[in-house]
From Swiss-Prot:
Entry-linked Pfam families: TMP-TENI
SUPFAM superfamilies, per the entry: Thiamin phosphate synthase
PANTHER family attached to this UniProt entry: THIAMINE-PHOSPHATE PYROPHOSPHORYLASE, THIAMINE-PHOSPHATE SYNTHASE
Binding residue positions for 4-amino-2-methyl-5-(diphosphooxymethyl)pyrimidine: Q42, F43, R44, D45, K46, D77, S117, K147
HAMAP family: TMP_synthase
UniProt KW keywords: Magnesium, Metal-binding, Thiamine biosynthesis, Transferase
Protein name: Thiamine-phosphate synthase
Positions of 2-[(2R,5Z)-2-carboxy-4-methylthiazol-5(2H)-ylidene]ethyl phosphate binding: T144, I145, S146, G175, I195, T196
Catalytic activity: 2-[(2R,5Z)-2-carboxy-4-methylthiazol-5(2H)-ylidene]ethyl phosphate + 4-amino-2-methyl-5-(diphosphooxymethyl)pyrimidine + 2 H(+) = thiamine phosphate + CO2 + diphosphate; 2-(2-carboxy-4-methylthiazol-5-yl)ethyl phosphate + 4-amino-2-methyl-5-(diphosphooxymethyl)pyrimidine + 2 H(+) = thiamine phosphate + CO2 + diphosphate; 4-methyl-5-(2-phosphooxyethyl)-thiazole + 4-amino-2-methyl-5-(diphosphooxymethyl)pyrimidine + H(+) = thiamine phosphate + diphosphate
Amino acid sequence: MSVTFEPGLLRAYFVAGSQDVPGQDLRDVLAKMLAAGITAFQFRDKATSTLTPEQRLALGRDLRAQCRVANVPFIVDDDVELALALDADGIHVGQSDQRVQQVIQAVAGRNIFVGLSCSTMAEVTAANAIAGIDYIGSGPIFPTISKADADPVVGTAGLQKLVAQSRVPVVAIGGVTVDSLPAIAETGAAGVAVITLLTHSHDVDADTAAMRQAFSK
């Protein structure tokens, strides 16, 4: 059974692929994050990942099953075929990935929600005109080490403008720390999407709780 999209799912949004947890099994890492209370998981296996397509599919099936048991949405990054094969709850695409209109058409009738990365006012304005986008990921809010080709930093002031411009909920991405959560929440963002904050965390339970609490209003 798929998880239906609602803005609260963006509060503590964990993003990871095998490349983000070297020396660890992503299944074990996700189990820990689910137990801590993440509200969404995006499978983003790319960049320096060494998995074959067959290994990626097998890993994705296991991660999808874990999310289903926890009733947490399983989102696939930038791969419509994989999202459909895994019966994902959502798919997230970037400005340079598959055209979002093509993605929306491909998942029509499959109860898969769609997220789009937008880092400028022009990109948000364009997204507002496209039916079928459920949320926007905006950033990087701060400098990030997790994405080598990241867009220029927008800061919380820039994020606030993007949130005000968007007709759909916005999740903040990039360089997020626990200390920055209050300032991000003040922009009106629905939540934060993080990699390093949790993969490098010394207290996953506390840090996940901090994310959920910051965006609980």
